């Protein structure tokens, strides 16, 4: 089972990701468990309490704490999680790779770009398990 968490404060993006991930899971018959967070502080609290994920989808621009800062903190607990940043701005692309981002996906999120990215990161997770 691949464990994925996503964190985005925008309710519309939150709903869109939920629908896309469900469609992906159904179409690809993916063994994927998804957990949603609206705040990076809640995600960090879960990780600090022992939750582990294989894939994280993080919004970059959030009010409580930005996704890049959250990723730096997450890396203190988990060096191997595949982090994909989601944002409407290219401004933080270089900085995202400093924290070991797997990918930097620009919003809006479209199925034709999201599904191949998910295929790639799911394959990377399978390779990491071997």
Feature annotation, model-predicted:
Residues 39, 66-69:
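Acidic catalytic/metal-coordinating carboxylates
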Residues 68-79:
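Short amphipathic alpha-helix used as the core "switch/output" element in two-component signaling
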Residues 62-63:
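The feature encodes the CheY-like receiver
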Residues 109-120:
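C-terminal output helix
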Residues 10-35:
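Two-component/phosphorelay signaling modules centered on CheY-like receiver
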Residues 36-55:
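Acidic, metal-coordinating helix/loop segments flanking the phosphotransfer/catalytic sites
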Residues 8, 58-59:
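Active-site residues of response regulator receiver
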């Amino acid at each position: 089972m691949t464990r994925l968490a996503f964190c985005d404060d925008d309710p519309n993006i939150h709903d869109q990701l939920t629908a896309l991930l469900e469609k992906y899971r159904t179409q690809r018959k993916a063994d994927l468990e998804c957990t949603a967070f609206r705040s990076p502080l809640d995600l960090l609290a879960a990780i600090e309490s022992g939750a582990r994920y294989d894939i994280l989808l993080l919004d970059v621009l959030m009010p409580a704490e930005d996704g890049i800062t959250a990723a730096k903190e997450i890396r203190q607990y988990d060096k191997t999680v595949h982090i994909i940043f989601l944002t409407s701005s290219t401004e933080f692309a270089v900085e995202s790779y400093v924290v070991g981002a797997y990918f930097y996906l620009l919003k809006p999120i479209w199925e034709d770009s999201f599904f191949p990215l998910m295929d790639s990161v799911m394959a990377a997770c399978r390779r990491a398990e071997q």
